């Protein structure tokens, strides 16, 4: 950042433009969109709270970020987790400005906040069967449902599916098909063997996407809109988005079936197993299975 970027909006705008140039290199498009959204809220906040279009970096105090945080949650009605992610972006830009010598101190350095840990949403085994077998009248809804199911049976997230090519589908020495790739988000390597259900979906839509892609992926908003209608038809009241498919694979199809966490971590393309532990939710079925195993091993040792 050059010396002339000494006001908050200018610095933030410059950083956001720089992110755009780095898309596909070391930053994702979703990161750029998030910073663009934060910039829009920041401009609105300055107008709302101070009747300003911009503010000098030297005039920033901790009270600024405190008021901005409250503004995001009250005026913008953002959930606590979303508001914290926006605060992360503002904090990052101000920290970079301080490190680059544009301000003598970081006024936000001591501001403490934490995002609440929200439970990961996933479909249970019963819900997954209902979701899979429910007859849908709309061809669009059926296609969007099948994309979601493919993600459920392979763990591949939306962006990785968007760029999934037929060249990534490789047979092993016994003829079983595998997907090999690197996650767009982290660069971490992942590898997943095809389940029969996923293979049927791949064959169903083979040749329908522009070469060399495996699927023609609609926008996430369009798929999620369809998922809301489908889950309602299936009698599922929870809010299900496309990313819930990845959670379903990890929790319902793997961890609930006794697959080791380290193995699931490799399939998900996580660089650290602590990331995978977020998915390790203990379900009632897992508890019941654990008690059954304890009972089997103890036999009648402690019977009255």
Regions found by a protein language model. Give the residues of each.
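N-terminal DNA-binding recognition helix of tyrosine site-specific recombinases/integrases
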Residues: 30, 38-48, 63-65, 74-109, ...
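Basic, Lys/Arg- and aromatic-enriched nucleic-acid-binding interface segment
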Residues: 80, 84-86, 103, 108-158
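Conserved tyrosine-mediated DNA breakage-rejoining catalytic core shared by Y-recombinases
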Residues: 118-121, 125-127, 163-201
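Catalytic-site neighborhood detector that most strongly recognizes the C-terminal catalytic loop/helix
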Residues: 122, 183-187, 220, 268-293
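Short, basic (Lys/Arg/His-rich) helix/loop patches that form interaction surfaces
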Residues: 137-138, 207-213, 225-266
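C-terminal catalytic core of tyrosine-transesterase DNA break-rejoin enzymes
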Residues: 149, 153, 159-160, 246-271, ...
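C-terminal catalytic core of Y-nucleophile DNA break-rejoin enzymes
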Residues: 184-203, 208-229
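C-terminal secondary-structure termini that scaffold catalytic or DNA-interacting sites
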Residues: 294-304
């Amino acid at each position: 950042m050059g010396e002339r970027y000494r006001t908050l909006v200018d610095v933030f705008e410059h950083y956001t433009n720089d992110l755009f140039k780095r898309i596909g290199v070391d930053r994702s498009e979703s990161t750029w969109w998030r910073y663009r959204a934060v910039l829009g809220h920041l401009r609105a906040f300055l107008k709302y709270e101070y009747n300003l279009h911009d503010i000098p970096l030297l005039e920033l105090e901790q009270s600024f970020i405190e008021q901005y945080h409250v503004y995001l949650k009250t005026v913008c009605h953002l959930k606590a987790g979303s508001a914290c992610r926006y605060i992360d972006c503002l904090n990052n830009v101000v920290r970079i400005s301080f490190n680059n010598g544009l301000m003598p101190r970081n006024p936000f350095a001591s501001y403490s906040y934490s995002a609440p840990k929200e439970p990961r949403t996933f479909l249970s085994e019963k819900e997954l069967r209902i979701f899979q077998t429910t007859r849908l009248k709309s061809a669009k809804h059926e296609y969007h449902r099948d994309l979601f199911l493919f993600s459920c049976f392979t763990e591949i997230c939306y962006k990785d599916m968007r760029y999934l090519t037929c060249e990534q589908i490789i047979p092993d020495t016994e003829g079983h098909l595998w997907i090999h790739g690197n996650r767009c988000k982290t660069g971490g390597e992942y590898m997943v063997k095809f389940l029969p259900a996923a293979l049927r979906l791949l064959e169903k839509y083979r040749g329908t996407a522009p070469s060399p892609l495996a699927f023609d992926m609609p926008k996430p908003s369009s798929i999620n809109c369809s998922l809301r209608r489908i889950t309602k038809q299936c009698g599922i009241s929870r809010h299900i988005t496309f990313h819930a498919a990845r959670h379903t694979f990890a929790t319902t199809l793997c961890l609930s079936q006794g697959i080791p966490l380290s193995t699931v971590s490799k399939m998900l393309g996580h660089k650290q197993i602590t990331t995978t532990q977020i998915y390790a939710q203990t379900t009632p079925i897992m508890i019941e299975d654990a008690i059954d195993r304890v009972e089997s091993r103890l036999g009648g040792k402690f019977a009255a």
